[in-house]
Amino acid sequence: MPWLCYAAGATLNDDIKSRYMDIRVGCGYDVHALAEGLRLVLCGVEVPHTKGCVAHSDGDVAIHAICDALLGALALGDIGKLFPDSDAKYKGIDSTLLLNEVVELIRSKGYSINNIDCTIAMQRPKLRPYIDTMRARLAEVMGIAVERVSIKATTTEHLGFEGREEGVSATAVVLLIEA
């Protein structure tokens, strides 16, 4: 913006930082196939179902989407970069441990989580009975108030892979603030 004047070496970004709180928004998405006989873990909570997620880790699509949103907000890559599925130490790992590590990384960069919003899409089972437990578990793992954690569930009205009960997806949005 040519009409703004800055001291030598100063930038518009410096001006914004000096006047406003630094906030960051991140978006994450994950999907896993479902298969008979596996555990279904969502938001760190085991949900009774005949099918579970096929994955290298425990397959918690919600936590994976949240991790990607957190990492994306600070341009730190994605969950696959930080925890590659080619590394045997992550085989079957509890995704809450991955989330905890991502949250610690975010904090080490000087940011805190203002809030998260996550939507899980699958046809069955109905997730409403588990939502409060999921919110509480995520709040505990991330060290934030449960009021700052929103988890929603939806079906796709029998459309797509979720509707055919072939898989589950999750989308997450996070807001980070400079601590």
Give the predicted meaning of each segment.
Residues I131-R135, E165:
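Short, low-complexity, polybasic intrinsically disordered segments
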